Amino acid sequence: MKVLLLGGTEFFAPFIADELAARGHLPAVLSKSNHDFGDGVPRFAEDPRDASAVLAAVTSWRPHALIDMLHDTPEQARLTLEACRGRVERSLHLSSAVVYGPNPTCPIDEEADTLRADLASPLASARIEADEVILAAIADGLPAAILRLPHLYGPRDPHCAEWFFAKRALEGRTRIAVPDAGLHICHRGFVQNMAWGVVRALTAARAPGQVYNLGEEKLYTLAQLTRAVARALDHGWDIYSVPGHLWRTPYDHTSFYDLRKARAHLRYRDRMIPRDGLELTLAWLCQEPRGDDWSWPDIDDPFDYERENALIDEHGRKLDL
């Protein structure tokens, strides 16, 4: 089956292209990026947000299926639908579990209400509206599916939340602070596992017309993840709980998803256990450390060790893991 990937970066798209090729499919990429998407993968060097470029790629290459990796605005969703309509047999639209927002009832399934677009962040609002465009087309009979992804991690991740913890370990920190006893559970997905899930969602017979959550099957608390990073780097440290209103880290919120539908319809299973995925990610980070300009949303200075030490001294409670 010929599959066109619409958009894509050097982080996620190559893993999807590799997975497609390994399953006997023929991937191609429409992207302005000059990244290497793999041996023998055709690249249409055009703007995937340009309707004429998308239509030209679809009509000239004649893919059987399309994976929309942009899917971040309702306008982009409509553009993609117009290119697909009557020209491809099925399409898959990669959304995000951010559309659910904070939800005290976990695990969150696909029937859960999404946020009201007018009350959501700009990013979540645009995703919600894009999903609504696709859902309306599905109701009209379009053979499409939506896949809601968690926070991705893995080699070549340009943001790489794990650097917050890895840098501390590599610099020999013997203490680390986590908010609220590190009890938060934030659903993550190792990039190779998620690429496998994408291909399953594209090819499974039951997928068209459906919405699926995807994520790792094994979940870590923030404290467990912090411990796992240290162990993977052969480092030891003491983990201290500090008040959450005083200290932020990546993954410091609870949001995890019900995967039963993906398991049943797509036969999804983690092919690589998260521990191994984390070790691969950290090995890459050791070879490709992030620069001094690395940042994370809502954290003013992620490596303010003086402040971290002061919080531990004043408020810290050592965790027994």
Segments (PLM) and residue ranges:
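NAD(P)H-binding glycine-rich loop region in Rossmannoid oxidoreductase-like domains
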Residues: N34-G38, P42-R87, V99-Y100
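Active-site "gating" loop of Rossmann-like NAD(P)-dependent oxidoreductase/epimerase domains
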Residues: S96-S125, E132, A136-D140
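Conserved beta-loop-beta element that borders a ligand/cofactor-binding pocket
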Residues: D131-R156
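Mid/C-terminal beta-alpha module of Rossmann-like enzyme folds, strongest
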Residues: R200-L259, H265, D292-W296, D300-L321
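Substrate-positioning beta->alpha
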Residues: H159-F165, V178-L202, G209-Q210, Q224
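Non-catalytic, hydrophobic alpha-helical segments
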Residues: F12, M194, V198, L214, ...
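Conserved glycine-rich Rossmann-like NAD(P)H-binding loop of the short-chain dehydrogenase/reductase
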Residues: L26-K32, D36
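N-terminal Rossmann NAD(P)H-binding glycine-rich loop of SDR-like oxidoreductase domains
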Residues: V3-R23
